[in-house]
Amino acid sequence: MIFMGSTETVLSVLVLVLLGYILKVLGVLGEEDASTLNRVVINVAIPSLIFTSLYRADLSGISDLVLIPVICMITGTLSGTIAYLWARRRGLDSGKTWGLTVAAAMMNSGFLGYPVTAGIFGSEGLVRAIFYDTGTTLMFTSLGLLLSHISGGEGSRIMKRAVFFPPLWAFLLGVIFNLWGLPTGIAGTILGYLSGAAVPLIMISLGLTLNFRFLRHSVADATLVSGLRLLISPLMAAGISYVLAFRGLNFSVTVLEASMPSAMLAAVLAIENDLDVDLVSSCIFMSTILSLVSLPLWSVVL
């Protein structure tokens, strides 16, 4: 990807998101089309991007990189715990309580994190973002199993989804092919073409999902989650990274990824576990909109 300044990067992201929203308003695409685009992104485009990036990367410092998903899980757990305690203090029901928890704990480190990080820090930054996003995948699996246990359901569906999650396999294969120096042949060229579709499809899909109608009933809760995701989480990540002696690009990418808004996967957990889907959608929407302001500020600081 071409290295760009932070302002140009976020502006490009905003334009692509708005393009998706405008296409929905004009009736060219519907909100239901987002699920189709998401399937293409998750099963084809993002795995291609992950494999290609890792295959071409310098992984000589992989011992430091493996700490990045650990920081992701720590900051996510702390943010989710704060949201859980807030909800309990307010006496919210279980659906709202756990809805706030998953929205605060899971960040959009892939769908939004990849293009923003790659645009600001280049291909080496993208590699670190991929490692960070692995932590989000582990958070998704852990929360899914926890919620299944609480609701008395079976965790096998979540575990199966995690085991067969295409981005996870792309991550593992990318690292293996890189470290062992395995050739990719024509497959490498094909994956390179497919990886180029990831960013525009991600942003257009995100624009299709923007919906204002849920927000008016959940402003206070969505504001709390947005504050946790966009401000508190990156500050916690900065503190943990400093303690672990992270410096330079490792530090910058880890903090930037921690400042991403609530993940779209939080809505998946809400739907599958009968949580308050409207509340989770409000948190995703507000934090995503506000991140268009906060991300340029964090990129300047970093």
Curated annotation (Swiss-Prot):
Q: Which GO terms describe its cellular component?
A: plasma membrane
GO BP annotations of the record are:
transmembrane transport
Major localization class: membrane
**InterPro entries listed in its UniProt record:** Auxin_eff_plant (IPR014024), Mem_transp_PIN-like (IPR004776), Na+/solute_symporter_sf (IPR038770)
The chain's disulfide connectivity reads none
Report TM segments. Answer: 10-30, 65-85, 102-122, 130-150, 162-182, 190-210, 224-244, 251-271, 282-302
What membrane topology is given?
Answer: Multi-pass membrane protein
Keyword terms, alphabetized = Cell membrane, Membrane, Transmembrane, Transmembrane helix, Transport
Q: Which domain of life is it from?
A: Archaea
The subcellular location is:
Cell membrane
NCBIfam families named in the record: 2a69
Query: Which family would the database say this protein is a member of?
Result: Belongs to the auxin efflux carrier (TC 2.A.69) family.
The name this protein goes by in its record: Uncharacterized transporter MTH_1382
Tell me which species this is from: Methanothermobacter thermautotrophicus (strain ATCC 29096 / DSM 1053 / JCM 10044 / NBRC 100330 / Delta H)
